[in-house]
Amino acid sequence: MKRALRQTCYISIENNENIGYQLFNIAYLINILNKSTRNHIKRKIVFRKGNHIYSDSIFKGLFTVLDDDKYDNLGFEKMSINDIDIDIESLCSSTKNIEIYNTSADTRNPIVTFKYIDEPIKRRILELVYSNEDLMYSAYYMYRGILAFFGENTSDDDIAALHILKADSKDYDYYYDALSIMNDLKIQNIAVITDDIEWAKTILNDINDINDTSTYTLYYVSNAEKNNYETRFILMSMFKNLIVSNNASDMDSMWASYLSYYDNKKVITADKNIIHKYITDIL
């Protein structure tokens, strides 16, 4: 006979505005929920309104978001992620309502890792990210438009996405080296995903100036559509080949490359600390 689950307990976590970091947080909470269920404890994820969760777009209708008074009435016990990570099993057997803090965008944050994210957790994250049909259609048609831009016979194998942000490390040689690797694979059609197109043009157009002829064809993805940040995140996950941003405070392209459905993909990163099984090159 199965033991009935105890009363519902709530769990929440401190977020920042980066979708990639939010996915690390959500994956961590799913892991806790799974372990709690094995201890016959039913636990539910909730967020305080204003906690940066994208509940009106990419995560629309997926999580309970409460106003301050309703959230505070649940009586959360605040726990540092550093304390939880030392003894996560104790939390998973607790019936208290827990709010996790100290989840800064930092490589020292124990949440920021793919080590514990197994295939069931990955599938659940995919379901969450791809649940908004409006964003999915927008990203899909953008991807088809990119293929069309590069030519009628262009395939998924022939293009790569490059994620570059204005707040990136000034080590732009990383991008030059990453593009050289793509060039060695005869991938010269590059979709540039950036938060500042004009700035990115000044950085990346120099790449072609280094060569006698224009080696790469660059397509700059528009930032004009509604919910462009969320749509661009989903768009990145549709690419087989991806050059991850070298911005340590942004995990979007790292997560997009992880979620991409392709098995044999080319994923290049500058981060030696946060890696997943699909990464092929660390520069």
Positions of the model-derived regions?
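Nucleotide-activated donor-dependent transferases that construct or modify glycoconjugates
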Residues: 2-17
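Short His-Asn-centered micro-motif
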Residues: 13-15, 47-50, 163-164, 192-196, ...
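Donor-binding and catalytic core of enzymes assembling or modifying cell-surface/extracellular glycoconjugates
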Residues: 19, 186-270
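Histidine-anchored nucleotide/phosphate-binding helix
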Residues: 22-37, 174-183
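Gly/Pro- and small hydrophobic-enriched strand-loop and loop-to-helix capping segments
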Residues: 35-49, 259-283
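Short, charged/polar "capping" segments at the starts of alpha-helices
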Residues: 51-56, 169-171, 197-203, 276-277
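Secretory-pathway luminal glycosyltransferase catalytic domains
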Residues: 52-187
